[in-house]
Every structure is written in structure tokens, then in C-alpha cells.
Amino acid sequence: MCNIVVFLLTLTLFLFSGLSNTAFARVQYEPLKPKFGARVWDQKMIKNIKIEVDGSCSRRAPGRRRPPNRPPKPCTKP
């Protein structure tokens, strides 16, 4: 019984001492060009980033409908 009390007391001590340390460990975000309206600048930069993604070569998962009577398209990816 005494071991459980000591364990819980130690656990709560570590919990509350760790909460204050996490505030110091966080890295604050700073935009590359801090200026008036920096948030708007960040949103514009995010909108300008475009990623090209090709289609998948995987087949569709089986569903409730019957599959069509045509063969699947061949994959053209290397």
C-alpha cells in the first residue's frame, strides 16, 4: 500500500514539473518576412505552392456492384 502511494506521489510530481517544461520547449513560428499582414503573406505563399500528383496504378477495391466486362487499364508508370 505504501509503495502505491509513493508511486502516485512521484508520478504527480513528474507530471506537474513536466508541464512547465513543455512551454519552454515549444518553437515559436516566425514567417520568413515579418511585416504588417504577415498572416496574409503566409496564406499567399501556401496557395502558390502546387504539387503535381499522377493517378494511381492500383485497382479499385471490390464493391457491391459487379465489375465491368472490360479489362483494367495498363499502368504506364515506371
Swiss-Prot record:
Lineage: Eukaryota, Viridiplantae, Streptophyta, Embryophyta, Tracheophyta
Cellular compartment(s): Cell membrane; Secreted, Extracellular space, Apoplast
Subunit structure and binding partners: Interacts with MIK2 (via extracellular leucine-rich repeat domain); this interaction triggers the formation of complex between MIK2 and the BAK1/SERK3 and SERK4 coreceptors, and subsequent BAK1 activation by phosphorylation.
Protein name: Serine rich endogenous peptide 19
Family recorded in the similarity comment: Belongs to the serine rich endogenous peptide (SCOOP) phytocytokine family.
Segment forming the signal sequence: 1-25
Gene: PROSCOOP19
Region spans: Disordered: 57-78
Compositional bias ranges of the Pro residues kind: 69-78
Biological role stated in the UniProt entry: Brassicaceae-specific phytocytokine (plant endogenous peptide released into the apoplast) perceived by MIK2 in a BAK1/SERK3 and SERK4 coreceptors-dependent manner, that modulates various physiological and antimicrobial processes including growth prevention and reactive oxygen species (ROS) response regulation.
One GO CC term on file: plasma membrane
Chief place of localization: membrane
Entry keyword set: Apoplast, Cell membrane, Cleavage on pair of basic residues, Membrane, Secreted, Signal
Motif SCOOP motif per record, residues: 50-64
Residues spanned by motif SxS motif essential for MIK2 binding: 56-58
GO molecular function: LRR domain binding; receptor serine/threonine kinase binding
